[in-house]
A protein has these predicted regions:
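Generic detector of leucine side chains in alpha-helical contexts
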Residues: 1, 12, 27, 39, ...
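Acidic/His-rich structured neighborhood in mature extracellular/periplasmic domains
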Residues: 1-73
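Sec/Tat-exported extracytoplasmic proteins
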Residues: 20, 39, 43, 54-59, ...
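Generic detector of ordered, mature protein regions
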Residues: 29-31, 48-54, 76-78, 82-85, ...
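Active-site/pore-lining binding-face segments in mid-to-C-terminal subdomains
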Residues: 49-107
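Pan-zinc metallopeptidase signature
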Residues: 99-163
């Protein structure tokens, strides 16, 4: 039974859990996200950014890929929401590279993976998670998961400024 959540941190016990039903490309990132909560990073967007930083600094290619994959998907989703034609152009056949094919394949597999679990239980789980986050101070609820794109942009700009 999948409730639409890839992980949960239980503050009372300090226990971080990652769902066995999460998509393979997201597993390492999800592990780092929940570990970030365990280390005291409560805000979802901050836990996402911390997970990205941990994954991207890892020598393990699975962790590094998972971090960059999730960062790409978050940025792509923000682009698609605000500039759909640019997002379409980014994925166009004219811009195909081996790396892009791998990422697109994983995006499609991840989408198929979660679509298989969609339904009443998943919707109820997302509603509960949204209420839970709002109760504990995340005003944007589940929308806060995507807000880490601002952190990624600021981090990348800081790297460029330092060069």
């Amino acid at each position: 039974l999948y409730t639409g959540s890839d992980g949960i941190f239980i503050p009372l016990t300090g226990e971080a859990n990652v769902s066995e039903n999460c998509a393979p490309a997201t597993l390492a990132f999800n592990m780092c996200h929940e570990a970030a909560h365990r280390l005291g990073i409560a805000a979802e967007e901050e836990a996402n950014f911390a997970a990205f930083m941990a994954c991207s600094a890892s020598d393990d290619p699975n962790f590094a890929y998972s971090g960059y994959y999730r960062a790409f998907v978050a940025c792509f989703n923000a682009l698609a929401e605000n500039y759909p034609s640019l997002a379409e152009q980014l994925l166009s056949v004219d811009n195909v590279t081996d790396e892009k094919v791998l990422v697109i394949r994983d995006m499609l597999q991840t989408s198929d993976h979660y679509t298989a679990y969609s339904g009443t239980v998943s919707e109820a789980g997302q509603a509960v998670n949204d209420a839970y986050l709002k109760t504990f101070g995340q005003q944007e609820g589940t929308q806060s998961y995507g807000e880490w794109v601002d952190y990624l942009i600021a981090w990348r700009a800081a790297l460029s400024d330092a060069s």
